[in-house]
């Protein structure tokens, strides 16, 4: 009989692979941003909250750099404020936990609660895109939603084998959020404008010349009062 520990280790390894795939899933988005030199309506929220370990920290730092380079001033300011707030918050948490919690159990509880909160935000952040309002899934990548679902499902199973509430809650909610995203994608996929539709150009219509006739009085030089004035027709061609 296979031991629960072995199953848990296997699920954990698979979870690590899927997590790595989760961090790499936005690569097509940022390749598009680099090519177009514009972030358009893509959001930085998932990147700002997903930096949860060493490998992802490096990957997400690259994403943030690309997003920052091609953002407008408003987005750059927002990112700067959020990153500065995160840095100050993490410093405050570290100092507070080290000085205020004197046992390993209490420190684990405090940090675990924070991990639950930020893990939940990580999964729910793509929902900040106004899919329902715009009736478009253009800025909610399908790959990110699929990998989020697989990642949350795998880590939920991992946490349930040997119950860990701090892993179960955020990843269980992550599965629900990912399902919601996939449902939204299925609903609004057909109403999303295709890229080729956006690039359609109206046919060029050749300008049509218009002939306009103007009747103007022609005066007689010998008649100052114009009593003997005659009329002449002048044809004017107008090119638009």
UniProtKB/Swiss-Prot annotation:
GO terms for molecular function: sugar transmembrane transporter activity. Keywords: Cell membrane, Glycoprotein, Membrane, Repeat, Sugar transport, Transmembrane, Transmembrane helix, Transport. InterPro entries: MFS_trans_sf, SWEET, SWEET_rpt. It is found in: Cell membrane. SUPFAM superfamilies: MFS general substrate transporter. Residues 34-46, 100-108, 162-164 are cytoplasmic. Glycans are attached at residues 225, 235. It holds the Pfam family MtN3_slv. The chain crosses the membrane at residues 13-33, 47-67, 79-99, 109-129, 141-161, 165-185. Residues 10-48, 110-191 form the MtN3/slv domain. It comes from the Eukaryota. It is a multi-pass membrane protein. One of its GO terms (cellular component) is plasma membrane. The keyword Cell membrane applies. Its main location: membrane. Belongs to the SWEET sugar transporter family. Mediates both low-affinity uptake and efflux of sugar across the plasma membrane. Forms homooligomers and/or heterooligomers. This is Bidirectional sugar transporter SWEET7c. It comes from Oryza sativa subsp. indica (Rice). The lineage of its organism: Eukaryota, Viridiplantae, Streptophyta, Embryophyta, Tracheophyta.
């Amino acid at each position: 009989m296979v031991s629960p520990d072995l199953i848990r280790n296997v699920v954990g390894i698979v979870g690590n692979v899927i997590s790595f795939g989760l961090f790499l899933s936005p690569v097509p988005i940022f390749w598009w941003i680099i090519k177009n030199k514009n972030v358009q309506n893509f959001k930085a929220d998932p990147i700002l909250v997903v930096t949860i370990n060493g490998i992802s920290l490096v990957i997400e730092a690259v994403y943030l750099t690309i997003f920052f380079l091609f953002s407008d001033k408003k987005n750059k300011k927002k990112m700067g404020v959020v990153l500065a707030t995160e840095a100050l918050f993490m410093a405050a948490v570290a100092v507070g936990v080290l000085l205020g919690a004197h046992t390993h159990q209490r420190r684990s509880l405090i940090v675990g609660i924070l991990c639950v909160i930020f893990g939940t935000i990580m999964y729910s952040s793509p929902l900040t895109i106004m899919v329902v309002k715009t009736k478009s899934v253009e800025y909610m990548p399908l790959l990110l939603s699929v990998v989020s679902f697989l990642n949350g499902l795998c880590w939920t199973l991992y946490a349930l084998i040997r119950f860990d509430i701090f892993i179960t809650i955020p990843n269980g909610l992550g599965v629900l959020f990912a399902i919601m995203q996939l449902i939204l994608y299925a609903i609004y996929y057909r109403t999303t404008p295709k890229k080729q539709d956006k690039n359609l150009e109206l046919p060029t219509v050749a300008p049509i010349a218009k002939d306009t006739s103007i009747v103007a009085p022609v005066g007689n030089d010998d008649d100052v009062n114009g009593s003997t004035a005659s009329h002449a027709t002048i044809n004017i061609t107008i090119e638009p």
